[in-house]
Amino acid sequence: PPPAGAGRDDEGLRAQRTFTALMRAMAAPGMIEKLVIPPGVPAAFPQGLAAVAVTLADFETPLWLDVQLASAPEVARYLRFATGAPIVEDPARAAFALVSRATAMPPFTWFSTGSDAYPDRSVTIVTEVQTWAAMHRFELTGPGIATTRSFAAGPLPGDFETRMAENRALFPRGVDLIMTSGDEVVALPRSTHLREAA
């Protein structure tokens, strides 16, 4: 049998590896990093979203679930057990918003963008995309990018470029965006400039 505490050690290692991947993704916008998927994720919960939520959320970080996730009670049960985080119905109160697919992403105006004094009191939106293929291709610039970086993902909302430009204009306020696809993750922090590639 495994030694006592081995399960907790495995859990801690998974969380540490995913946390490191997320920090690398935030530091290098548009770069794909690998997540470690936790066990027992409900079928209705995209695995990448679960990995990010379990790693970043705790009892002090309210979570908001989109309609599809909220309609599957096992998702909220899993999150409460794995994180202790409260589930909120008001998106403006959320520290993290979990969106089952990027095309269903609500307007950023639903969420807190922080304040000039406390820009960190804003939301991080975590959403799932189907692919990193060139359904929508963009050029990224900003902190963590030496010159420009090509980034593609899809499908995305039709107004995605406009949303990101409006969000960047709020800096240092604004939302941070994390995209997952299976066990892969990309981050687009609020400091990132995004424009559609020619």
Regions found by a protein language model. Give the residues of each.
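N-terminal, charge-rich interaction modules
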Residues: 1-62, 66-69, 81, 182-184, ...
